[in-house]
Amino acid sequence: TKKIGKSGLNRKQIHHSFPEYVLPEDLDEKGWWNKDAESLSELSERVSRVINTLKDRAEENIRIGLVAHGGFFSSFLCTLFNLKPAEGTAFQTYNCSISQITFEKREKIVIQYLNQYDYLPKNLRVSRPKCDI
């Protein structure tokens, strides 16, 4: 089943809500997204690029914050653990949960914690209803 992408906020809508933002010139009234949803193979390629970038920067002794949707993060963890998301493996995460993963060296990855959400008030703790992968 082909997933159809939606346009997202357009230039006018973003500027109205966030007038201080500097927007890219190519963002127009059609919105910031103009493609269909990415395929599983496209997602896997994007996840691999991100992981390789993090590994390449592992010894810089810096902190990098990664904000991602649940599907991306599930694929990210599957890739780290050499699991195949297409074969039914998925990590379900709470909305706004935080995880700390340290890339100490290119081939040494330490997971301090995953999917913590206890900092959120109970009324804001909402899990993903289903895993799409």
Q: Residue locations for each model-derived region?
A:
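Generic structural signal for well-ordered alpha-helical scaffold segments
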Residues: 15, 44, 48-56
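Short charge-dense sequence patches
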Residues: 1-5, 28, 48-52
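Generic beta-sheet signal
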Residues: 62-70
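Soluble or luminal CAZymes and related metallo-dependent hydrolases
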Residues: 6, 39-47, 93
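Short, active-site-adjacent cap segments at secondary-structure transitions
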Residues: 72-74
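Acidic, low-complexity terminal tails and accessory targeting/binding regions
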Residues: 1-20, 56, 60-62, 78-133
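Short glycine/proline- and acidic residue-enriched helix-loop micro-motifs
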Residues: 16-42
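Aromatic-acidic/polar surface patches that form glycan- and anion
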Residues: 3, 36, 40-43, 65-66
